[in-house]
Amino acid sequence: MARVKRGVTARARHKKVVALAKGYRGRSKNCYRAALQRLEKALVYAYRDRRNRKRDFRRLWIVRINAAARQWGIKYSQLMKGMALCGIELNRKMLAEMAVNDKAAFEKVVSAVAGTCGYACAVNQQDK
């Protein structure tokens, strides 16, 4: 059986790992073993945080919706329940975007919910 020299494949593998570790600090950017460990840890963090990002954004959207809704005298939970009863199907991402950038549209949603459910909110009191 012929002898296999593994230098070429090992060198290619090492180069790939070191290239992926570009931008790291210290030995992690150019020492293969340190780079491999740092890279594995980075991939673990990336996997974990792709899931955490979904949670974090949902929490952010809820905080923004709640803050905007309370300016009109209605709580987040009341707003969401009222939207379900009214048949308004806006997801939290779009609702938070409206609350920040399109206050007039958000006010219309709040007034529709308040009118249907009978919540006393600032929108209804301005009309009177």
From Swiss-Prot:
Q: Which Gene3D superfamilies match?
A: 6.10.160.10, Ribosomal protein L20
Q: Which UniProt keywords apply?
A: Ribonucleoprotein, Ribosomal protein, RNA-binding, rRNA-binding
Question: Which biological processes are named by the entry's GO terms?
Answer: ribosomal large subunit assembly; translation
Please name the PROSITE patterns in this protein's record. Answer: RIBOSOMAL_L20
Which Gene Ontology CC terms are recorded?
A: ribonucleoprotein complex; ribosome
Instruction: Show the GO MF annotations.
Output: rRNA binding; structural constituent of ribosome
Please provide an example of a Pfam family that matches this protein in its UniProt record. Ribosomal_L20
Q: Name the InterPro entries on file.
A: Ribosomal_bL20, RIBOSOMAL_L20_CS, Ribosomal_protein_bL20_C
User: Which NCBIfam families has this protein been placed in?
Assistant: rplT_bact
* Function of the protein: Binds directly to 23S ribosomal RNA and is necessary for the in vitro assembly process of the 50S ribosomal subunit. It is not involved in the protein synthesizing functions of that subunit.
The entry assigns this protein to a family as follows: Belongs to the bacterial ribosomal protein bL20 family.
Q: What is this protein called?
A: Large ribosomal subunit protein bL20
Organism of origin: Anaplasma marginale (strain Florida)
